[in-house]
């Protein structure tokens, strides 16, 4: 299965008639493995800051999580495993696997819990596969 299929079928899936706004699977180095057409263009330093927060949980809290020029307020996640952010009625979930970052961006009517479930379910599956 291609990485794009994981994005298209597992991240951009339909939940009660709604779906994520954007999603991607990127390497720890910031290289894009696959992304939805709506995923924002991001900078390598934004990914580096996310990776730093996985190594040093809480490092993003003072500045926020920035992706594609959008700033998200960092909210409770799972240190070293999941970073969650909020912006207005939407937000972001980032799940770290052994080799990749699984990223989902959502807006209402999708809920934070639905985004977390979609992103973390795929991340857990990839971790189980040694990825």
Curated annotation (Swiss-Prot):
Family: Belongs to the profilin family.
Signal sequence annotation: none
Protein name (database record): Profilin-6
GO cellular component: cell cortex; cytoskeleton
Record text on subunit structure and interactions: Occurs in many kinds of cells as a complex with monomeric actin in a 1:1 ratio.
Pfam families: Profilin (PF00235)
Keywords: Actin-binding, Allergen, Cytoplasm, Cytoskeleton
CDD domains hit by this protein: PROF (cd00148)
GO molecular function, one term: actin monomer binding
Domain of life: Eukaryota
Cell compartments where the protein resides: Cytoplasm, Cytoskeleton
Function: Binds to actin and affects the structure of the cytoskeleton. At high concentrations, profilin prevents the polymerization of actin, whereas it enhances it at low concentrations. By binding to PIP2, it inhibits the formation of IP3 and DG.
């Amino acid at each position: 299965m291609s990485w794009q299929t994981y994005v298209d079928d597992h991240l951009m899936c339909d939940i009660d008639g709604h779906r994520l706004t954007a999603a991607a699977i990127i390497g720890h180095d910031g290289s894009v493995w696959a992304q939805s057409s709506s995923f924002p263009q991001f900078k390598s330093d934004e990914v580096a800051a996310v990776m730093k927060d996985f190594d040093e949980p809480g490092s993003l809290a003072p500045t926020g999580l920035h992706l594609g020029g959008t700033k998200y307020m960092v909210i409770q996640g799972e240190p070293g495993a999941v970073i969650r952010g909020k912006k207005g009625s939407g937000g972001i979930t980032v799940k770290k696997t052994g080799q990749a970052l699984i990223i989902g961006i959502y807006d209402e009517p999708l809920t934070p819990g639905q985004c977390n479930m979609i992103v973390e379910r795929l991340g857990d599956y990839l971790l189980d596969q040694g990825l």
